[in-house]
Swiss-Prot record:
GO terms for biological process: defense response to Gram-negative bacterium; defense response to Gram-positive bacterium; innate immune response; killing of cells of another organism; negative regulation of cell adhesion; negative regulation of lipopolysaccharide-mediated signaling pathway. The lineage of its organism: Eukaryota, Metazoa, Chordata, Craniata, Vertebrata. The keyword RNA-binding does not apply. It comes from Macaca fascicularis. The gene is DEFB118. Disulfide bonds join C27-C54, C34-C48, C38-C55. Residues 109-123 have a biased composition (Polar residues). One of its GO terms (cellular component) is extracellular region. GO terms for molecular function: lipopolysaccharide binding. The keyword Signal applies. This is Defensin beta 118.
Length: 123
């Protein structure tokens, strides 16, 4: 039982002491490590997950960038499909007027004024 209690803290602390067990991720073309703080002689090249820095040894040339194959361009001459897919955008304009303007127009358009009908209530 004492051996188990002694082995348990060792297994818990082992990943913190040994980087290989700590799971430090590789970054920057597998030449750097993600850490909270870089060691002496290391430079920060990018940001890793969980707010960690990608620490790369500064004595090596790490300007290598992953190579990608160039994307071949198709025929650049416009075809019939390009003409069909051309969309012209139009904007509709609306005229906004106030109630006062509308009342003035309606009064000018009506030749005669009619009074509202009288309503009689009987009980």
């Amino acid at each position: 039982m004492k051996l188990l209690l002694l082995a348990l803290p060792i297994l818990v602390l082992l990943p913190q002491v040994i980087p290989a067990y700590g799971g430090e991720k590789k970054c920057w073309n597998r030449s750097g490590h993600c850490r909270k703080q870089c060691k002496d002689g290391e430079a920060v090249k990018e940001t890793c997950k969980n707010h960690r820095a990608c620490c790369v040894p500064s004595n090596e040339d790490h300007r290598r960038v992953p190579t990608t194959s160039p994307t071949p361009l198709s025929d650049s001459t416009p075809g019939i499909i390009d003409n069909i897919l051309t969309i012209r955008f139009t904007t509709d304009y609306f005229e906004i007027s106030s109630k006062k303007d509308m009342v003035e127009e309606s009064e000018a358009g009506q030749g005669t004024q009619t009074s509202p009908p009288n309503v009689h209530h009987t009980s």
